Amino acid sequence: MDKTIEMNANPLVEFLRKPSKCFTKADIIAFIREKGIRMIDFMYPAEDGRIKTLNFMINDYAYLETILTDGERVDGSSLFPSFIEAESSDLYVIPRFRTAFVSPFSEIPTLCMLCSFFDKNGEPFECSPERTLHRAAAAFEESTGMTFEAMGELEYYVIADDNGMFPAVDQRGYHESGPFAKFNEFRKQCMAYIAQTGGQIKYGHSEVGNFTQDGKVYEQNEIEFLPNPVETAADQLVLAKWVIRNLAQMNGLDVTFAPKITVGKAGSGLHIHMRMMKDGKNCMIKDHKLSEEARRAIAGMMILAPSITAFGNKTSVSYFRLVPHQEAPTNVCWGDCNRSVLVRVPLGWTSGRDMSVQVNTLEAEANNDTTLKQTVEMRSPDASADIYQLMAGLCVACRYGLEMEKEEALQIATDKYVGIDEAKKGLSKFEQLPDSCVASVKWLEKQRGLYEDKGVFSARMIDGIIRALNKQDDSNLRESAEKDSKLMQKLVESSFYCG
């Protein structure tokens, strides 16, 4: 029995009896025929981070074969205004069969697929975020011999009218249950739909943020994923945001992934966990502790952290979240189980003990390989990020740390490490993260060569990112907004539906 296929929530995996990475055009057509699918949706995230959709009617078998093979053309200048001019803007979109899923929302049976962009010469579009991540993952594997895997923690607020019943404690919503947590069932429905699209979910829960304001209840939730090859991980996060928003609209709820929605309340992040794999083994851990490879990768993230904000924090409001005492990082450092550091090493089941048999005394020891669970977590990004650019940037940073002289990288990791006792004294001795989009641009300009190395990020893409971020013109804006509630509200509203 293949345990990855049995009980799989994706109807295509269940029907075809194979993992999604093995889907072929023939498989897609067989499923369409058997299940009475009438429409095809091509889906692709644009520069604003949101999924765009192109609908096709399956007129006949010949047309179905054509769209699956040849794709379609789209206006690239509308999708990527910072990278493409209107005078030469046409792109092709070609479906990736491994991403196929049945739309959980369409009344007409519809099969959806994420697409890749190609230029007029039939070459992958160099500024496509998805292709950039592909190049980053390939360069990482070629350089290190390891594969880069990731998963995200997707935080969001659900907003609805406050009926005054069973109020939760302000800023104490972590893992709360109903009736004090109002949207547990909505979150579970989101998780079920995300799983149907192919998302591999670890768990979901209510988060710290919970407050009432102007007759509305604001409840923060989180859905966390399982580690996957980094390209798959990015696809799953993009689709998850699409699912949550659509389901909220159907239920008469409002949802925001914005990094900050009011002063003094927990903001929403998009924490990214990473691990490096080789031959089915997790290279993050050795002899029950963090490996040298992991610490060298962390060193790379310490060096590139300021410029990674250009990919992971794309609105001015992003930097209102990166302030002290809000479980968000402000300084470039790392540590164990510490939510104030930039890169956190969470608990990783490193004791080697089977805890289950201690409470389930009828069971035999399972001898599971718990080393697979160890990750490290980058805590600065939020959902304004271009998820593909962000994960590509993290690939580059970890590769850079591994390509440095070994002793130099390990020394950087040592210098940037914060122990528990040291953290209590404050982190001010460490370099601060940028405080605005404009400040992040300055770091990207300094470090762009590292991202362009091996052709991962194109110069054209970096130029476009710099132009877009500079338009925010937000130097000193955080300080001004903290003193001006009307300005703060205006900025929050402008990024309410970001990403």
Region spans (language model):
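A hydrophobic, small-residue-rich beta->alpha segment in the mid-to-C-terminal subdomain
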Residues: 374, 381-383, 394-452
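Short hydrophobic/aromatic-rich motifs at helix boundaries and adjacent loops
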Residues: 1, 162-163, 213-218, 363, ...
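Histidine-centered divalent-metal-coordination microenvironment in nucleic-acid enzymes
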Residues: 114, 153-167, 210-224, 258-280
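ATP/Mg2+-dependent ligation/transfer catalytic cores
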Residues: 1-210, 228-242, 253, 389-390, ...
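Active-site capping/gating regions of soluble enzymes
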Residues: 17-18, 26-33, 38-48, 52-121, ...
